[in-house]
Amino acid sequence: MAEMKTDAATLAQEAGNFERISGDLKTQIDQVESTAGSLQGQWRGAAGTAAQAAVVRFQEAANKQKQELDEISTNIRQAGVQYSRADEEQQQALSSQMGF
């Protein structure tokens, strides 16, 4: 397995990328819901029922994906905080041992 190197700033940047993607997805969800809402009065019969069901499936899947992206972002941010804390503790321990 390849070695992974990172730092707190990189983790924060990547968390921001996931937040941006989540925000973009939310924009798409809102656009689909708006379009579906404006067309809903025109949906009739089996085709209308199928269209409504498709919108519901889309909403469920997209909302689940957004939730996953938000959780990933949170986890990355927490990892960055933990990384910084551990780095600081190691720096203090080393400084203490060396008498700095």
From Swiss-Prot:
> Which UniProt keywords are given for this protein, alphabetically ordered?
Acetylation, Cell wall, Chaperone, Coiled coil, Host endoplasmic reticulum, Secreted, Virulence
Q: What happens when the gene is disrupted?
A: Bacteria no longer translocate from the phagolysosome to the cytosol of host (human) cells probably due to polar effects on the downstream esxA gene; bacteria replicate in phagolysosome, decreased apoptosis of infected host (human) dendritic cells. Loss of ability to lyse host (human) lung epithelial cells, possibly due to polar effects on the downstream esxA gene; in BALB/c-infected mice bacteria are not as invasive and cause decreased lung disease. No growth in the human macrophage-like cell line THP-1, no cytotoxicity. Inactivation leads to absence of EsxA and EsxB from cell lysates.
Any coiled-coil regions, as ranges: 7-42, 49-86
For region Required for ESAT-6/CFP-10 complex to bind to host macrophage and monocytes, the annotated ranges are 87-100
Q: What is the effect of changing residue 62 to S?
A: Abolishes EsxB-EsxA heterodimer interaction with EccCb1, weaker interaction with EspA, maintains interaction with EccA2 and EccE2
* Gene Ontology terms: biological process: protein secretion by the type VII secretion system
User: Which InterPro entries does the record associate with it?
Assistant: ESAT-6-like_sf (IPR036689), T7SS_ESAT-6-like (IPR010310)
Ranges where the record places region Disordered: 81-100
Q: What subcellular locations does the record give?
A: Secreted; Secreted, Cell wall; Host cell surface; Host endoplasmic reticulum
According to the UniProt record, list the residues that bear N-acetylalanine.
2
* Main subcellular localisation: secreted
Q: What would you give as a GO molecular function for this chain, any one?
A: host cell surface binding
Q: List GO terms (cellular component aspect).
A: extracellular region; host cell endoplasmic reticulum; host cell surface; peptidoglycan-based cell wall; plasma membrane
Q: Where is the composition biased (Polar residues)?
A: 91-100
Phenotype when changing residue 94 to A: Abolishes interaction with EccCb1, but not with EsxA
What does the record note about the induction of this protein? Answer: Constitutively expressed, part of the esxB-esxA operon.
SUPFAM superfamilies assigned to the protein according to its UniProt record, in alphabetical order: EsxAB dimer-like (SSF140453)
Record comment regarding domains: May be secreted as a 4 coiled-coil complex with EsxA. The C-terminal domain is required for interaction with both EsxA and EccCb1; the last 7 amino acids are necessary and sufficient for EccCb1 binding and secretion.
Miscellaneous: Genes esxA and esxB are part of RD1 (part of a 15-gene locus known as ESX-1), a section of DNA deleted in the M.bovis BCG strain used for vaccination. Deletion of this region is thought to be largely responsible for the attenuation of BCG, and esxA and EsxB in particular are quite important in this effect.
Q: What does this protein do?
A: A secreted protein. Acts as a strong host (human) T-cell antigen. Involved in translocation of bacteria from the host (human) phagolysosome to the host cytoplasm. Might serve as a chaperone to prevent uncontrolled membrane lysis by its partner EsxA; native protein binds poorly to artificial liposomes in the absence or presence of EsxA. EsxA and EsxA-EsxB are cytotoxic to pneumocytes. EsxB (and EsxA-EsxB but not EsxA alone) activates human neutrophils; EsxB transiently induces host (human) intracellular Ca(2+) mobility in a dose-dependent manner, monocytes and lymphocytes do not respond.
The UniProt similarity line reads: Belongs to the WXG100 family. CFP-10 subfamily.
**What's the protein name?**
ESAT-6-like protein EsxB
The species this protein belongs to is Mycobacterium tuberculosis (strain ATCC 25618 / H37Rv)
